[in-house]
Amino acid sequence: EQKEQQFALDQANKWQEISQYMEILIKGQKKETNGLRIPSDMKPAYFEWIIWRSILAIDSLVNSPEQVRKFKIDADFLPIFTAPGGTADLVAEFKDYRLAVEVTLSESSRQEAMEGEPVRRHVADLCQKRDIPTFGLFLARKVHTNTAETFRHGLWYYDDDSPVDLKIVPFSLEEFKNLFDWLFENKIENKAQKLRILLESCLQGKDSLTAPEWKKTMKETIKNQILVSNSL
C-alpha cells in the first residue's frame, strides 16, 4: 500500500507519459510509440489503468489510490484484468465531490445498449451516499449520439420510486486528453476543482438541447476553457 501511495505521488510528474498512452488508444496504434505500447488483448484494462493514472495525477484525492481503482494490478502497478461488473470502473473522492468514471472501447450503436443502464445504475448507487455531490464521467474513443441522449435524460428511479437527477458527462477520450494536457501544460492549480467546474458547465442547459447539440456544446466548452485560459 505504501508503494502504491508513492506510485500515486509520482503520477503528476508522469503526465506526458499518461497523455501518450491516451494518444495510443485514440489512434489505435499497435506498434511501440516512444517506448510505450498497449498489448492488443489488454486494451480495455489499459484504458481503465490510464484513466486511473490520470486521476492520481490530478491529485487532491480523499480516498486511497487502491480505493479509486476497481481493477487488479501486478507488482509493477500494471493492470491484470478490467474492473468487475456491478460497480463503476473508477471512483475518485475529492473534498467536495465524488467522481464515478466509466470507460468503454465500444463505439457503435451497441454502445448505448451495453453502457447506458449499467453506467446510470452505478452512478445512482453512489448518489445514495448523499454526503457530497456525485458526478459521472463516461469516456469512449467516440461517444455514440444515442449514448449521449441516454445520459442527457438524467432521471433515475430507485426501487421505492424516489427519483434522483444523475449528473453524467460523456466525453470522447480525445476531449478528455485535451483537458488533461491543458491542466498540466498550464500548471493549473486545484485541478480537481477545475474539473468539477468544467463538468458543471457541460451539464448546464442540456435539457433544452438535442443529443447532437449537447455533444457539440461540450466539445466547445472544453475548447473555450482552454482558449480563454491560454490567452490570459
Where are the language model's segments positioned?
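Catalytic core segments in nucleotide and nucleic-acid processing enzymes
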Residues: 3-230
